[in-house]
Structure formats: structure tokens, C-alpha cells
Amino acid sequence: MSIRSQQRSLHIVFVLYRYFPFGGLQRDMLRIARACVERGVSIKIFCAEWEGELPAGIAVERLPVSGFTNHARNRSFAEAVKKYLQREAVDLVVGFNKMPSLDVYYAADTCFKAKLMQERLPQLRFLPRYRQYLRDEKAVFGRDSHTKILAIAQRSVDEYEKYYVGAAQRCTVL
């Protein structure tokens, strides 16, 4: 028996709110998941919704969520992920949407706080929807976060750093 066969497989959880086959972020997530599986990594994908074919060799689990609004369902999903992580051991949690409990975040989105402050009325940040999105973003980019960030462009890193000082130190541009 070789040393390699005695080693436990790395267990990574990928999380995203919604999978649909024509989304760019979703295609990136699935491509990364397949590349991990090819290297012997155990991948489990958590989502609230999955449209399309399930990927061969990759476990997909739809977590039940509640809420009448998108931001309420997103919060419910993040809470369900957190509960799962409290009872199951995983090596790494990779998020494709901003939420708490991530070890790594694949930053395909722009900075929500920048968009809110520059393009919309800053007063909107007091509405429940915007407060939730800002809390989720802060959970990833805030000063107290330890989440590692994989950015697809340096421009995104610069924008996040403007609103979340210190976040750039945890960013790697792909």
C-alpha cells in the first residue's frame, strides 16, 4: 500500500446561491470543481437552486431556504451552510457568492458598496436588502475577515481596497 493511498482525500465544499448552465460564474465554478475532482479532491456543491444536469462525479446538495425576498433567501442559505459546517468536517469552503463562513471567495462580482455609493443613492444602504448585501460583502472583505480572495482582475482588487482597507492583502489576481 502506497503512502498516497493511505492519505485522506481533501474535502472541499463549494457554495453558491443558484446554478444555471448559462451563467459565467456558474460555468467557472463547475470548471474549477471538475479540475479539483480530476486531481483527487472530494467536492460537494451546496446551492439553493440548481437548473440543468447534475455533474458526474460531483455531489450537489440543494439546501432548503426560506424567505419571500432574494436577500432573505440568501441569508437563509448562508445560515444553512453555517449549520452544515458546524456538524461536518471539511477542509475548505469556497464561495462563489459573498457570504459569511468562507475560507476562499472567487470574486467575479464588483464591489457592492462601491456601486451603492457611486451609482445609487447612498441612503439605500439603510434598507434591509442593501444592509444584507453589505453585511455579506463585509464578511468577506472586512477588516476582521480571514477569507482569501481570488480576483479575476486587478481593477476589482483596487475597488475593494478603496472600501475595505486591508482586503487587497488577502487577494490573489488570477
PLM feature spans:
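An amphipathic, basic-hydrophobic alpha-helix
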Residues: 67-93, 130-139
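N-terminal strand-loop element at the rim of the active site
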Residues: 9, 16-22, 35-72, 84, ...
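Conserved alpha-helical elements of sugar-nucleotide-dependent glycosyltransferases
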Residues: 24-31
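Hydrophobic residues at beta-strand termini and immediately following loops
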Residues: 63, 106, 174
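An aromatic- and histidine-rich active-site surface loop
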Residues: 90-116, 129, 133, 138, ...
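A solvent-exposed, charged loop/short amphipathic helix patch at secondary-structure junctions
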Residues: 117-126
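Membrane-proximal helix-turn-helix segments that form the acceptor-binding/catalytic region
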Residues: 129-152, 163-165, 173
